[in-house]
């Protein structure tokens, strides 16, 4: 896990009988924290992945679940998971007050299920389109232009940085996105196909054709910007993606309470 801090920890520990006698003087030592032999998951998507829940709940840290924050430092995973303090990649910095995220519980659940330490890498960003997560070179980008303040491919570069920092391999992607694309008829209709392309790009990047994606259907929207029809279209696209793309899984969120017009609580 410590490769994200630009450190590689490798040593050959001999038996204690070969160590210097402590009576001969001080022995130099180094303490290296947050090392685990386990699995690393990438957290990507928009604000409901970043975490904006406002009601406190019992969701304590777990000693075997760690988080690589936006500052590229490892800590015991705790809310808020997408804190932008000292971020190393400002492209995904969220500068609003963060709240609780579903992915601390995801980490503890994976830890119990797999029986090993879990590392989470936070790269999500609120108010983003799928086109920002696709590579700028993806051939569908020209068909679905984004507003000027949402540069195509901007979040894909963050994904590349995060994957490279852990040696190019991760165990899976936790993905929660789609609210922005649901505002646009064409993007909503094309979402399943374009998401399949995103999955393919990430799997190619990680050299793992079976890399799992754990996705969440969007909840409803009550801000007047996105209609119930569009939300339903997006949820159906996300359901279809999980049926059509191998090792893409989906869970619903439309039964969750909300903290405001678009965010889960």
For each feature predicted by the language model, list its residue ranges:
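Cell-envelope and extracellular/periplasmic
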Residues: 1-265
């Amino acid at each position: 896990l410590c490769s994200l801090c630009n450190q590689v920890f490798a040593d050959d520990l001999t038996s204690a009988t070969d160590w210097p006698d402590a009576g001969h003087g001080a022995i130099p030592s180094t303490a290296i924290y947050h090392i685990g032999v386990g699995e690393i998951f990438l957290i990507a998507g928009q604000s409901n992945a970043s975490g904006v829940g406002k009601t406190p709940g019992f969701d304590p840290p777990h000693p075997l679940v760690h988080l690589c924050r936006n500052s590229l430092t490892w800590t015991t995973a705790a809310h808020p998971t997408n804190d932008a303090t000292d971020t190393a990649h400002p492209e995904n910095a969220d500068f609003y007050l963060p709240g609780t995220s579903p992915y601390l519980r995801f980490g503890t659940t994976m830890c119990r299920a797999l029986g090993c330490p879990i590392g989470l890498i936070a790269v999500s960003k609120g108010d983003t389109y799928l086109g920002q997560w696709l590579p700028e070179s993806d051939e569908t980008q020209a068909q679905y232009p984004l507003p000027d303040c949402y540069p195509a491919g901007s979040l894909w570069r963050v994904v590349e940085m995060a994957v490279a920092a852990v040696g190019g391999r991760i165990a899976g992607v936790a993905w929660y996105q789609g609210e922005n694309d649901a505002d646009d008829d064409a993007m909503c209709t094309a979402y399943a196909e374009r998401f399949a392309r995103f999955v393919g790009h990430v799997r190619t990047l990680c050299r793992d054709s079976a890399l799992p994606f754990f996705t969440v259907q969007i909840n409803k929207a009550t801000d007047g910007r996105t209609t119930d029809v569009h939300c339903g279209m997006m949820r159906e696209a996300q359901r279809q993606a999980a049926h059509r793309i191998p090792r893409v899984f989906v869970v619903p969120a439309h039964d969750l309470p909300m903290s405001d017009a678009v965010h889960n609580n």
